[in-house]
Amino acid sequence: MKGGGGGGGGGGGGKRRWKVLVIGVLVLVILSMLVPLAFLLGLHNGFHSPGFVTVQPASSFESFTRINATKHTQRDVSERVDEVLQKINPVLPKKSDINVGSRDVNATSGTDSKKRGLPVSPTVVANPSPANKTKSEASYTGVQRKIVSGDETWRTCEVKYGSYCLWREENKEPMKDAKVKQMKDQLFVARAYYPSIAKMPSQSKLTRDMKQNIQEFERILSESSQDADLPPQVDKKLQKMEAVIAKAKSFPVDCNNVDKKLRQILDLTEDEASFHMKQSVFLYQLAVQTMPKSLHCLSMRLTVEHFKSDSLEDPISEKFSDPSLLHFVIISDNILASSVVINSTVVHARDSKNFVFHVLTDEQNYFAMKQWFIRNPCKQSTVQVLNIEKLELDDSDMKLSLSAEFRVSFPSGDLLASQQNRTHYLSLFSQSHYLLPKLFDKLEKVVILDDDVVVQRDLSPLWDLDMEGKVNGAVKSCTVRLGQLRSLKRGNFDTNACLWMSGLNVVDLARWRALGVSETYQKYYKEMSSGDESSEAIALQASLLTFQDQVYALDDKWALSGLGYDYYINAQAIKNAAILHYNGNMKPWLELGIPNYKNYWRRHLSREDRFLSDCNVNP
C-alpha cells in the first residue's frame, strides 16, 4: 500500500510539472509574437521624449533620437581614446606637480624611452621668466597676433596638448562652410522647437513640415562638410527652413522646454568637439612617434645589403681611441639624422681628418647604420658605429636611451605667456650618457651631439675651451629657471639658476671620472626611485642634481634651440648660431616638421644613395 501511495503521489507531481512546462511554452510563444509587433509599432521608442524625430542614422547631425541613443557609445569611444592617450603618456608622479601633456605626451613610460620622431615629453608646469636671449621681441609678433587677450581657448590648448596646438594653429586651412554652419544653426533651432509644436494637435501640418525639413537637413549635412559639397537649390531649403522656424516661434511655447533642448544640443556639441580634439591629438602624436614607412624601408634595405656584402666587420682603427684627435659622440637610432649631423660637422670643419665620430645605436639599427656609413663615407673623417646592447660593461643598463625631452608649460594668466610661446622643450642626458666614461676609457674629452642638430660652424675651437674645472660645457636656457619647475621638490637647488640643455655638450671625461659623476647620478636615481614618481621625473631631478655647479656655460651663439616647436625664431639668430637644435616634436625628417627650418637640415642629406629613391625617402 505504501508503495502504491508513493506511486500515486509521484504521478500527481509529474502532471504538475507537465502543466508548468506547457504554461512556460505558451508564454514563450506569446512573447515571440508580441515582441516583434512591439518593434514594428515603434513601442521600443517609448523611452524618448515625445515628439523627437527618428531618422536613419547617417552623421553626427542626425536627430536628437539618434544622438541620445549614441551618446553613451560616443562617450565610450572618448574614454577609449583617453585610455590610449594615457598609455602614450609617461606615468608621471602623483605627488609632484608635473602634469602630462598628450606625450607631448615621451609616449612610453619607462627609462628607455626613445624618440623616433620624438616621443612626447612629460609636461612641467612653470612660472614666467625672462625671454631667451637668442630670440628678439619682434620674433613673437606672430604669436601676439594669434593669441589675443580674449582667446583663452588657444592658450588652454597649448598648455594641455603642447606642440599639437602650435602645429594646428600654423597649418589650419580656412574652410568655406558659411552655408553649412547656417544650416547647422537652423537645424539646432528647429530641433529645439519641434517637441513643443508636436504637442499641439491643431498644428499637425506644421509638425510634418518641421519633421520633413529636419530630416532633409540631416541628410544633406551627413554628406556635406563645406559649401562646395552642398546640393543645388540649397538657398531655397534655407529659406523654407527659416519660414518654418519663424512660424513655430509665433506660437506660445514652453520656453523652459526650448531652453532645455538647446542646452542638450550645446552639451552634445561640446562633447563631440572634445572627442575630435582628443582624436586629433592622438593622431598627431602617432605621426610624431611612429617611424615613417620610407625610413623603415631604408633601414630594412640597408640591413639586407649589409649581410649580402663580403666584408661584415670593420677593421679596428687606432683612431677610435686616440686622445689626440677630436672625438664626437652621437646617440641615435635614426640613420638619416645621424648622417646629417656628421655631414654638416665635416663640411664646416677646417681639418676633417682629425674628426672621429662614435655613433651609439641599438641592435635593431646597428647593421643598417653601419652599412650606411660604409656606402656614404664622410670625407676624411672616421666613423665608428657601436651596438650599445653588445658592449660589455659591468652593472650597467645596456639598452639605448636617447636624450630625454621635457615639455615646460606656463600656467594661464601669466603676462609673459600672453606675449610669447607658452610651451618650451628641455632636453637632458639619458641613462646612456652616463656610460660614456666607461665606453671611452682612453679618451679625456668628447663633444656630444644630439641627432636632431645641424652644424653650421667649425667645432674645433670647443677643444680649446678652458672649462675652469667643470665637467659639462653646455648652452644654458634662461627661458625657464630651476625655481619655476614645480616637479623639483628634492635637493638643494639654486632657484634662480638657468637650465642647461643637451644638444651640444663638451664633456671632460677625465674630470667626470675623477668626480664620479656617473656614480653620483645612480645614487640620486636610486634614492628617488623609492617613491611613486615616474622614471622621467626621477631622471630630470637626478640629472639636475648631479651636474649642479658642474656646468660651464657656453656662449649662446654656439647653439640655438627650439626649431622643433617654435615657428617664430628670428632669422638672424638662426644665421648666427653654430648649431641648430630641432628639439621638440616637429623634427625635420617628419612631414610635420616646420617647413621654414627644413632646408637647413635637407642641404646636408646625402641624396645620391639609390636606396633613398627606392624607398621614396624625401623628408
Curated annotation (Swiss-Prot):
Where does the record place the region Disordered? Answer: 95-139
Write out the transmembrane intervals. 20-40
Kindly state the tissue distribution recorded for this protein: Expressed in roots, inflorescences, flowers, siliques, leaves and stems.
Polar residues biased stretches: 124-139
Where is this chain glycosylated? 68, 106, 132, 343, 421
Where does it primarily localize?
A: Golgi
Pathway, per Swiss-Prot/TrEMBL? Answer: Glycan metabolism; pectin biosynthesis
Looking at the UniProt record for this protein, which Gene Ontology cellular component terms does it annotate, in alphabetical order? endosome; Golgi apparatus; Golgi medial cisterna; Golgi membrane; trans-Golgi network
Q: Which residues face the membrane's Lumenal side? A: 41-619
Q: Where in the cell is it found?
A: Golgi apparatus membrane
Q: What is its EC number?
A: 2.4.1.-
EC class name: transferase
Q: Does the keyword Membrane apply?
A: yes
**Top-rank lineage group of the source organism:** Eukaryota
A GO molecular function annotation here is: polygalacturonate 4-alpha-galacturonosyltransferase activity
Pfam families found in the cross-reference section: Glyco_transf_8
Q: Which GO terms describe its biological process?
A: cell wall organization; pectin biosynthetic process
Cytoplasmic face of the membrane: 1-19
How does the entry describe its membrane topology? Single-pass type II membrane protein
What keywords were assigned to this record?
Cell wall biogenesis/degradation, Glycoprotein, Glycosyltransferase, Golgi apparatus, Membrane, Signal-anchor, Transferase, Transmembrane, Transmembrane helix
Its biological purpose: May be involved in pectin biosynthesis.
Which family does this protein fall into?
Answer: Belongs to the glycosyltransferase 8 family.
Matches recorded under PANTHER family: GALACTURONOSYLTRANSFERASE 4-RELATED (PTHR32116), GALACTURONOSYLTRANSFERASE 7-RELATED (PTHR32116:SF12)
Q: What name has this protein been given in UniProt?
A: Probable galacturonosyltransferase 7
- Give the organism, scientific name: Arabidopsis thaliana
